[in-house]
């Protein structure tokens, strides 16, 4: 199976040398162009465009970036609940055609209630997952029905709904999702194509893949799996560990980070899982390094792989061996790291995956 490499683009330059998140305020078209082109030239297959209740609108960001690039696809984060699902179905289909099929969608329900409140949604999280499942069902009905249809559900009802535009990709662009709660897994097993998880130890990842495959099989589905990691690479292993410790020092030296975040801890189930591994040990499986996850309260993609490019690529291929077919990778110096990953890491991952596929086929 071909391996998919995903990056993440932001719209403004980072505010420090060691950046945890790329979603910041403002909007710089020049920086967005440079960032997207760097991913395009580096060999990334997709670039995630994140979502927050205060950031630039993701689909417009992705459409602009698509106009500045040649082949890069875009994984656009989208929160159900703020747009009618039939309208969103047409929006996704339109985007897919205008970009020549360079779209995937990451379904997010909102990490915190405060984030949802900022856009006027006061629904509890369990309800948001049920709403998202119904939303996805209605979107897929809009894509698949050639005649007007009716739908009555808990959250949405339509009469005579139809769409004159359907996605270029068949049956539709890939739908990603993440989360570790029962609601997230129930939604994703039935309606999504790729389960996105944070970088956990190999044994835990193997268990999660097996469990979710079983859950999706009940609906006749064979999902893909994405693991999110922060590679920290250097010419020698010692230099890579020195670099990792410098990044940690920069992170923990920031006002508002470190002990406060570690004390409060993550609020979502996926973050709680990540924090449990970070508290268990600094290093798992030789290269999976967790102190940044611990120091920042496991806020998002904070598990790292540390080593030379060859060592980190080999570590990632161990996840590929388990059935992970895509990786979201980004560094702490977002633009420069994307360039370095394209030069040193991505070719090794892709060639290693092809070699592994060849060995499997020969058996």
Indicate residue ranges for each PLM-predicted region.
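N-terminal beta1-alpha1-beta2 module of alpha/beta enzyme domains
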Residues: 1-71, 168-173
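An alpha-helical appendage that flanks or caps ligand/catalytic pockets
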Residues: 2-12, 111, 119, 125-169, ...
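Hydrophobic faces of well-ordered beta-strands that scaffold small-molecule active sites
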Residues: 3-9, 47-49, 73-78, 103-107, ...
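Short, acidic/polar
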Residues: 24-38, 91, 178-187, 305-319
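Conserved, mostly hydrophobic/aromatic
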Residues: 39, 43, 65, 95, ...
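Glycine-rich, proline-tolerant flexible connector loops at the mouths of alpha/beta enzymes
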Residues: 46-65, 199-204, 329-342
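Alpha-helix-loop-beta-strand connector modules within alpha/beta enzyme cores
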Residues: 58-79, 131-135, 217-221, 341-358
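Glycine-rich anion/phosphate-binding loops
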Residues: 81-97
